[in-house]
Each structure stands twice: as C-alpha cells, then as structure tokens.
Amino acid sequence: MKRIITILCLAACLQGAWAQNAVENIRQRYNAMKELIASHSGEADTNGADNGTFYHLTGTFNLPATGFHTEDTYLYFEDEEDPTEEKIYLPHRLTFATTRYNFAPRVYYEEYLYDADGRVAFIYAYDPMMAFDDDEQDMQYEFRFYMEKGRVVKTIVRKKSYDEEAFRNVWQGNQLPKKYERAHSSLVANAAQLATLFKDIEKRTYSYAE
C-alpha cells in the first residue's frame, strides 16, 4: 500500500513539474512576442512588427440592434524553415494573433499564441460583460488559458465590477473548472477560425511559396 501511495505521489509531482515547465515555456514565448511588437510600436509602416511578419485586417459595419461595429485583427507569422529543402520563398507559420472588436459600447480583446504545430498554446481574453452564476451581476472578466498539445495545464480567471479599479483572482490552478469550459471552448474555436483565416490569406497573397 505504501509503495502504491509513493508511486502515486511521485507521478503527481512529475505531472506538476511537467505542467509548470510547459507554462514557463509558454510565458517565455509570449513575452518575447510582446517585446517584439512593443519594440516596433512607434513605426507607422509596421505597427508592431517587422515588415512582412503580419497581416492586418479591419472591418467596419452596422449591426442590427447594436449599431456601429468594428473589428481589428493582427495575424503575426514567421518563416517555417525546412532543413531538407532549399526554397527561395519559405512557407509561413502563424505564431500570434490579436483581435479587438465591439458590440455597442462594449469592447472585447483577445490574444492567441500558437505552437509549432499550429495548435493554440495560450489564450488571453478580456470580456467586458459576463456572468457565470444565476445570482451574479455582469462583471468584467479576464481569462488566461495555458495549453500543451491541446490540453489545459493552467487556468487563471480574474474579474472586477464596474466600480472596481483592479481585477481580483477568482480561480488559479492546473485544471479547467467546469463553469469555465464553455468560455474556453468558445475561445479555442475563435483561435481555430483565425488560423483558418491566416491560411486562406496565405493562399491568396503568398501562393508562390507552395
């Protein structure tokens, strides 16, 4: 019995160390990407990245009931090198995406970090009006989901009322609580849509890399 308990404890420790290492790697990649964008944020021609490393899409139109609506999306990419082939035009790989949009006066913001296989590895999202419990008033929420090969390894959820200045933690852990599964699934779907959009743009603007 003691041996089984020891093995289980060891497995739990190894699992925790693996998850922590995955989170740290994601944070390093995320910080490096944000530093790259910030280092070029003053350049009008690049607007946050070196020339040729992003697509910028904007849309503006009127929606029934909510009125004026705008979407502002950046898709950042890098060359995907293949040591087995020599190509003049290297294929591109989506690395990071940001999108800001509104419904009426409410402004939403999301960030997506992708791994080398094209899977979303990190999600940050700000939702200006959300409630998870029947007796809860609408609050402002921040979500951070860290993922390794599609599996959530860390979740951070913060919220604040419209009268509060700072967000406060309501959940932080290595699991994805059931009450936040729907929000997570919706954001993962958004990440997949942006990845598909990137591929469609590449087919039109960078087809000679094939």
Residue ranges and their predicted role:
Residues T99-A125:
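Mid-length scaffold segments of soluble, non-membrane domains
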